[in-house]
């Protein structure tokens, strides 16, 4: 019997969010990338664990990223997408190589890129045919702010927001992250975590803004790492009316870009 393989290349851009007045709303994709090269034997290889792909990683953060499919963020997201879609495991023998150009913890959306790469990986290897809107639903179950992941998924200069859902859908979209991406124990087998919470439909929505081709982005990357959660802790709980009004005026200028 002849053996062939399916190959995929998935490339996800870095992003910058909170652009100008667009806090938690406006994101911009940048020309640094997380690239996955994926090979799936066809017919599937009988070697190795059913849902334990062979993972290699180069580039930024190569010495920090776990190569276990149950610990790596990208493959955990992919497995979440697969299991929500009725596919319980990765194809046996899957080989995944990741090359990353996006610095970690520097405000360039490294975690958002990893999440979107996982959604695209699950869709590709499971042959799911998910719509872009459904992919965003899965991403928003992991990254609860839409700005980075939306820009990483659709590219360009975008505004995004969370829709107002009915109570049952709101509850489904608000389950703890520990239930969406559980911490797999060392002895986790293929039956562990088989029934993850399904994302409701239409969690997020986005619109594209115009972007003049003459505009170029310059990113200044600090030498220190700072998590998004830590950075958000310095923000005040409320803002003066005059600041909100000024922000609205600035927001109206997006159309001139």
Where are these regions (language model features)?
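DPxDG-like acidic metal-binding loop motif
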Residues: 32, 108-132, 152-163
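ATP-binding N-lobe of GHMP and related small-molecule kinases
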Residues: 1-106, 123-130, 165
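Short amphipathic alpha-helical face segments that pack within enzyme cores
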Residues: 76, 113-121, 249, 253
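Gly/Ser-rich catalytic serine loop of serine hydrolases
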Residues: 101, 105-113, 147
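ATP-dependent small-molecule kinase catalytic core of the GHMP/sugar-kinase superfamily
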Residues: 130-257
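Short, conserved micro-motifs enriched in small and acidic residues
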Residues: 68-72, 108-116, 245-248
């Amino acid at each position: 019997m002849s053996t062939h393989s399916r190959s995929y290349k998935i490339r996800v851009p870095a992003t910058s969010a909170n652009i100008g007045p667009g806090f938690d709303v406006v994101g911009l994709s940048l020309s640094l990338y997380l690239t996955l090269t994926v090979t799936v034997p066809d017919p599937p290889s009988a070697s190795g664990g059913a849902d334990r792909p062979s993972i290699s990683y180069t580039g930024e953060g190569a010495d920090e990223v776990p190569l276990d499919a149950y610990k790596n963020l990208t493959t955990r997201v992919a497995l979440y997408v697969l299991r929500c879609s009725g596919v319980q495991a990765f194809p046996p023998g899957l080989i995944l190589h990741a090359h990353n150009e996006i610095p970690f913890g520097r405000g360039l959306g490294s975690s958002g890129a990893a999440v979107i790469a996982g959604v695209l990986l699950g869709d590709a290897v499971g042959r799911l045919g998910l719509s872009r809107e459904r992919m965003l639903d899965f991403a928003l179950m992991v990254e609860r702010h839409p700005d980075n992941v939306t820009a990483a998924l659709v590219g360009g200069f975008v505004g995004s927001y969370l829709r107002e859902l009915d109570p049952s859908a709101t509850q489904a979209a608000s389950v703890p992250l520990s239930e969406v991406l559980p911490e797999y124990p060392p002895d986790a087998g293929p039956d562990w975590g088989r029934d993850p919470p399904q994302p409701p439909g239409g969690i997020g929505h986005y619109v594209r803004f115009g972007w003049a081709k003459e505009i170029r982005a310059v990113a200044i990357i600090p030498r220190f790492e700072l998590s998004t959660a830590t950075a958000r802790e310095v923000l005040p709980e409320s803002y003066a009316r005059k600041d909100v009004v000024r922000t609205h005026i600035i927001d109206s200028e997006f159309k001139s870009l």
